């Protein structure tokens, strides 16, 4: 049997982390078995569905490199197919027209709740022989079995059973002629030959209804797997108040797609004590029976740890591609400065996100207006004039601008003055970067460049002179 799964988001908002994890699990399951992965946009909610949300879903999938073999399919383009199936069901008696008014249904619901009963349709029109006018508004309901039960073996949770007495006759077409979500899903899964439905646990109650419709249509019933929800660090369902945002916000915040994928796969799935997984490893090892039934808590610190790992373990050229987007957002012109690959090598150990890296690399490309106040107060004092002038002379004398020669100039200055490297390195660091922290001075000064470094040392010496004049 060829495995075929689908990811079927509703375009009413951004692709959030829960949806991204569901997409990842479906994608991994399919790729593990060499099957096919379908992208389907369930846009039947015409009032809430937006093109912006569709674009955000597509952007998120592409950024995460979760490619699809079919689609994207749009339910709004398949209404003729859904209605043709409904008409066929009306003919063979597996569906019927319901003329109950909204007022009657509201009264029924209120009475049932008052009596402590579960609100459900009472079947008044199910076997009614009453005649109604052709123009009288009606919906179409599925004639759900009234006896027996629906049992399915959830691939994550095990056997789940629903009594048919608990399921009412689902509306499958509204009064305006549009098919409903639960029905469209069934026809899509049937037509697209979906073998495994992997989705969030909030869909468990939809499953018995969908299975009954599939059986009424004589369609094969796929396997189902329902993934547990993601919680915030307070134990409550992850939401916007926890900072939960669309997947692309993680891109904007400087996370690598490899880090987010690694984090999401471990958010409910495990393989021993292993924490780091390449996409190839995930694909090889992923199984549904290793997915936990329990909810998982989102931990931003863990994601940052993984991101730091990938910043420093992926090829610098690959990381630099993502960094280039970050520096563009900050308006940094990198044409006059080191290649971004060098920035990744220089700042990788110091940064948890690429946004942090982009913000930290400005001094390699742009002049700064002022020195960090604390760093200047501590290191750009009159006593720093001699080492700065001496190291400037040695840097200016370099004819072949290499990291080794820069290092020798700094070390040579310290040796000649008979002081520790810090007495030269710290004033030099503040002079050329404007701050008190940076990578090693030899690699930093080399990356900034000879002319720019000398100019900044002059600026620092002028700052010291102004400071002396004010004392």
UniProtKB/Swiss-Prot annotation:
It comes from the Bacteria. One of its GO terms (molecular function) is ATP binding. InterPro entries: aa-tRNA-synth_I_cd-bd (IPR045462), aa-tRNA-synth_I_codon-bd_sub2 (IPR020751), aa-tRNA-synth_I_CS (IPR001412), aa_tRNA-synth_I_cd-bd_sf (IPR008925), Glu-tRNA-ligase_bac/mito (IPR004527), Glu/Gln-tRNA-synth (IPR000924), Glu/Gln-tRNA-synth_Ib_cat-dom (IPR020058), GluQ/Sye (IPR049940). Coiled coil: none annotated. It catalyses: tRNA(Glu) + L-glutamate + ATP = L-glutamyl-tRNA(Glu) + AMP + diphosphate. One of its GO terms (cellular component) is cytosol. Keywords: Aminoacyl-tRNA synthetase, ATP-binding, Cytoplasm, Ligase, Metal-binding, Nucleotide-binding, Protein biosynthesis, Zinc. A motif ('KMSKS' region) lies at residues 237-241. Its EC number is 6.1.1.17. GO terms for biological process: glutamyl-tRNA aminoacylation. Binds 1 zinc ion per subunit. HAMAP family: Glu_tRNA_synth_type1. Catalyzes the attachment of glutamate to tRNA(Glu) in a two-step reaction: glutamate is first activated by ATP to form Glu-AMP and then transferred to the acceptor end of tRNA(Glu). This is Glutamate--tRNA ligase. It comes from Yersinia enterocolitica serotype O:8 / biotype 1B (strain NCTC 13174 / 8081).
